[in-house]
Amino acid sequence: MKKLLATAILGLASLSALAGSATVEYSNVEGVNGAKNGKGYLVNWNDSITKTLDGGFQMTTAQTDGTNSVSTRVEASLTPKYALGFGTAYIKGSVGLKLNSAGSTEFYAVEPGIIVPLGGGFSTRIGYRYRAAFDSGIADTTRTARVGLTYALTKKDALTLRYDQQRGNSEQNSVNFAYTRSF
């Protein structure tokens, strides 16, 4: 399973040179229910495979404040999109690898959501992400409700402000700031 997952991730990573867009993101993380605060960083490459299907690859790194604890995730995704009269529905499916000092863990994630244009260059995205380890004996299950607001600076540049509320084996709220460049 690890070899198959690594091959899929590396294959999508090699395609990232042909990406239609790239995103960089900073997250300010507030731990809840006794969890510590932290910071997060994300780099994402995304491209349209067809008019209704996107493929993506992303890397995230999270650091817990006051510790040397760092966790990195590498993730490949496919996102079918469905046009609605007022916006676009999507269901993002991902597989990935979590790396930290304890080793590595394979995981999957599913995120249904909706993107609604608001006019004046603004759009909003509302989604719900479920993530879990393939190995049910590993405590890496989270449920994240998210809402974001994007402003298109130009046809190729956008800024996003997003709020995530994550519960499960990791309990935190985060405010996320992202810049996306389309090519």
Predicted regions, residues:
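Outer-membrane beta-barrel proteins
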Residues: 2-183
